[in-house]
Amino acid sequence: YDGGNQVMSLDEKALTELAKALEETGETALAAIAEQFKHSTRTAVATILENDDAPASVPEGYLKLHLLSHRLVQPNHTNLSGLFGVLLNVAWTNEGAIDIAELADRQIQARLENRNLSVNSVDKFPKMVDYVVPAGVRIADTSRVRLGAYIGEGTTIMHEGFVNFNAGTESTSMVEGRISQGVFVKSGSDLGGGSSTMGTLSGGGNIIITIGHQCLLGANSGLGIPLGDRCTVEAGLYITSGTKVTLLDDHNQVVGQTKARELAGKDDLLFRRNSTTGTVECLTNKIRSINLHNCKLPVTVSL
């Protein structure tokens, strides 16, 4: 190794030296794994990243996904630019990853040998738990969590929950909705059944969505702005950055109107839809936290 980001094949001699070096630094568990690799029938590969550049190869891409799922890097804190162009579309089966071009032949061969070759997915990303099972989590349907998801200890993901790569939860959360790419949910926040967060891959632009502590997205709700702490979005309400929001004080009196993006990141907000007028409303017991002087529309406030 002579510096930079490199991918190197390791023979038995190199693995022996690696195991010895790991043992000397106190990494006994990794040293034991390196020793096991010496008996593999597959080529052992070491991927070294000195710089956080965009992944230039499949091993570099998968290493970064592993760093996320091992909780060594939080979402949006490593460069994943161009990852889709680097990774290949693969059939993920009960016999491991199979090249799409070889899949039909492998299926026929399995039938001839009276074996079952089950294709779990055809994707660039495998399910996380085939490679990483973080401590202290519950995942009801493991196929709905991709490798590269960051799942904090104490998180429960129910059957309808989904977590994309480069997204996830900080700690204790109940996930029954979709956490899209780039979205990070802080501790104590819950996503109700069928709820959705807007990511940066499809339609979300470059707005990175963060959900603060102790928030709730109601069932079938949607979120396109970052939330501060202790916020609630009522069931069935989808908020985008351009949604016009009527602001109410703690006496339910209208104090102004603004776009939802102006409320991004603010604490103690409740978003709801008026069932009579259809207007999207925002309430808080801390009216000053709305910071109305930043709103683009003129408003009059009596406090």
Where are these regions (language model features)?
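Short, surface-exposed recognition loops or helix-turn segments adjacent to catalytic cores
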Residues: 80-84, 158, 172-174
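Glycine-rich adenosyl-nucleotide cofactor-binding module
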Residues: 107-159, 163-164, 168-171
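Glycine-rich hexapeptide-repeat left-handed beta-helix
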Residues: 180, 184-187, 191-303
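General structural feature for long, well-ordered alpha-helical segments within catalytic domains
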Residues: 61-64, 135, 229
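Terminal amphipathic alpha-helical/low-complexity segments used for targeting or macromolecular assembly
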Residues: 1-130, 262-303
